[in-house]
Amino acid sequence: MVDIIVTENGNVRGVFTRVISASLTDSLNGECTFQFSVISSAAKEIFTGLEVELKSDTLNYLFNVVKVSKSLSNGIAICTVECEHKSYELNNDEYKLAEFDFEGAPSECLISLLQGTSLTGGICDPTVPIKLKINRECTRRAALMQLIALCGGEIEYN
């Protein structure tokens, strides 16, 4: 069973175990989004800015709610919630990099890229030293994707 846990500042606002539909996209190119639909009356406490945890025995993802839309289907009010993985926060202006110059282990580069954010790095399989130089403004998420490409690796979210 998969639980969809909606929180605000760490406080649980709702737990959904039964939904009309749900879709998780977790692709090798770095895209990680989640969308689910529930009956509107059950979702009246959901709005943009909340966090959604997708949790089961094999899954553990953390998302931000970015869009909530309502519709009617056969006379039933439906609420659709669209979410982006927490790593999308790295696209925010506050995390932009003017430049970045790193030489060393990929795991240390990951730590450096995530420093000062709400995210932490997990297991980093590549160990061959790398050089990553960025000399124009970019988001930390773009820099993270460059690191992944440079290592020939994949990103796995949780």
Language-model segments: residues:
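Assembly/oligomerization scaffold segments
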Residues: 1-99, 145-152, 156-157
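Charged- and aromatic-enriched interaction segments used to assemble
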Residues: 82-158
